[in-house]
């Protein structure tokens, strides 16, 4: 189950209220690295859909629904602690329609659009490979944020208004299209599979491999996905 998954399961068993969820085990990571993405997604598909349905029932909301949306986080969880070495995606399930559902539920447009722009940025970095690989590279999302703040005459992110955050989302998605040649995914399940695979991929990223060598952590252990 990995560290996060095991601890969450244990807290749940002793009655501590934790958000509902599920864990894809470290064994699947090993299979992923052996069989490849397409085969593992095919093998996992039905189980993940059933697990999401269980979370939907507990949360009384629907993944990808525009009226009563369920958002999820997707996190790594190795057996040994590897802080900051692997990847996380938050607010997954958002798109242009779902964000309006969040506004209707919360009554807070700024919260909804800020969550959305953070999700697009995080997904672009982690799943779509737009994160800079060294200090010399410019982060396209951070560059856009600075450009918009300058145009609006503000210095801090939290000074941006709802319409500014909407502009950020639009510009972020245009940057995704320009850099990847593809539109930002709007289907919740397409987003989910991208995130699951990105977490498995992060087990073999350069910084994680180096950290494991330094700490004596075997490559074969793999990471869980929560």
What are these regions (language model features)?
Residues 1-226:
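Nucleotide/phosphate-binding sheet-loop regions of phosphoryl- and nucleotidyl-transfer enzymes
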């Amino acid at each position: 189950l990995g560290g996060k998954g095991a601890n969450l399961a244990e807290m749940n068993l002793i009655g501590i209220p934790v958000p509902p969820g599920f864990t894809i085990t470290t064994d699947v990571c090993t299979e992923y690295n052996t069989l490849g993405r397409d085969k593992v997604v095919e093998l996992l598909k039905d189980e993940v859909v059933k697990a999401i349905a269980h979370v939907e029932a507990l949360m009384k909301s629907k993944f990808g629904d525009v009226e009563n949306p369920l958002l999820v986080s997707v996190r790594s969880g190795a057996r040994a602690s590897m802080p900051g070495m692997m990847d996380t995606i938050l607010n997954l399930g958002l798109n242009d329609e779902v964000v309006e559902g969040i506004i209707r539920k919360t009554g807070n447009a700024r919260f909804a659009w800020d969550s959305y722009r953070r999700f697009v940025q995080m997904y672009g970095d982690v799943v779509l490979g737009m994160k800079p690989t060294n200090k010399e590279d410019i982060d396209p999302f951070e560059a856009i944020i600075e450009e918009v703040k300058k145009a609006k005459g503000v210095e801090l992110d939290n000074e941006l208004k709802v319409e500014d955050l909407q502009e950020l989302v639009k510009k972020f998605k245009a940057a995704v299209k320009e850099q990847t040649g593809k539109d930002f995914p709007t289907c919740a399940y397409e987003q989910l599979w991208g995130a699951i695979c990105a977490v498995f991929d992060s087990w073999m990223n350069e910084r994680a491999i180096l950290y494991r060598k330094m700490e004596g952590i075997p490559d074969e252990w793999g990471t869980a996905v929560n």
